[in-house]
Structure formats: structure tokens, C-alpha cells
Regions:
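Metalloprotease/metallohydrolase-associated module, dominated by Zn2+-dependent proteases
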Residues: 1-44, 50-56, 61-80, 86-92, ...
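Short alpha-helix carrying the canonical HExxH Zn2+-binding catalytic motif
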Residues: 91-107
Length: 147
């Protein structure tokens, strides 16, 4: 089942990233400083997109899996699609959330892109449960540095 879902998840993330890179805003100087401290290499590629709700996958199988794992819900405040970051409107300007999502950007870079990141992140979520995976805990630790 995982090997069926992974390509769907990769395509969905690629589509989301394209939209965010097209419509999103570049980081401002304060946000760039946070990104530098988080260790992102490609600072100029990052875009933020303010949304009323973080979108869910349209594919029914992928949507059901994301909801069952607790990865995306109406309560999701942010989501990173490699260099594109969705930020829910009521969290716009929240430094901690931004730092958390930027930590995921750094993880995408470190792990080598969308497929390697999703393979590891989703495997951790399935094995340890969300939000107990190593990558998510790393992002939570980064978030705390910017409280």
C-alpha cells in the first residue's frame, strides 16, 4: 500500500509546490534570517502562500491516508512542499510555525528532494505515529528555538 501511495504523494507535493512558487511571496529579511539559522541552502527559492485552509489531496486514496495518519486536517496550520510553504491565515506571521516549516525545507534539501523526504517522513509517521517521527521532532525542536 505504501509503495502505491508514495508516487501519488510525490505528485501531489510537486503540484502544490508549483502553485506556491507561482503565487507565493518570497521571504522578507527577518524570515530570511530565520531560514539562514535553520540551515537552508537555497534561500531565494522559498515562497510562502497564505491560505484560509491548508489544501487536502484530491485523490481519494491519498486523502484518506493523509487524514487517517493525522497529517492533514482542518487544524493543519502549515505544510511544506519542498520550497513552497502553505501558512494558514490565522498563523500568518507566526515565527515558530515558520521556523518549523523552514526546518522541513532544510530536510527536503538534506535528504535530496521530494521522493527521498516523503519516503522517510511518511515511513516515520506510519511507524512512530504523527508527530512522533524523527523528522517531525527535529522540526519541533527548531520551532522551540524561535519561541
Amino acid at each position: 500500500m505504501f509503495e502505491e501511495l508514495l508516487p501519488l504523494a510525490c505528485r501531489w507535493v510537486e503540484e502544490q509546490e508549483r502553485g506556491i512558487l507561482r503565487d507565493g511571496l518570497p521571504l522578507d529579511p527577518e524570515q530570511l534570517e530565520i531560514a539562514r539559522k535553520v540551515g537552508i541552502r537555497e534561500l531565494g527559492r522559498i515562497r510562502l502562500l497564505e491560505v484560509h485552509e491548508v489544501p487536502e489531496p484530491e485523490d481519494p486514496l491519498l486523502q484518506a491516508a493523509a487524514e487517517a495518519a493525522g497529517l492533514i486536517s482542518l487544524l493543519t496550520s502549515g505544510l511544506t512542499a519542498r520550497y513552497g510553504i502553505f501558512i494558514r491565515s490565522d498563523y500568518w506571521g507566526n515565527r515558530q510555525l515558520l521556523a518549523h516549516e523552514l526546518a522541513h525545507v532544510a530536510q527536503y534539501e538534506r535528504l535530496g528532494g521530494i521522493e527521498p523526504f516523503l519516503r522517510r517522513y511518511l515511513t516515520e509517521c506510519l511507524n512512530a505515529g504523527y508527530p512522533n517521527g524523527e523528522l517531525e521532532q527535529e522540526a519541533k525542536a527548531v520551532e522551540k528555538r524561535f519561541a
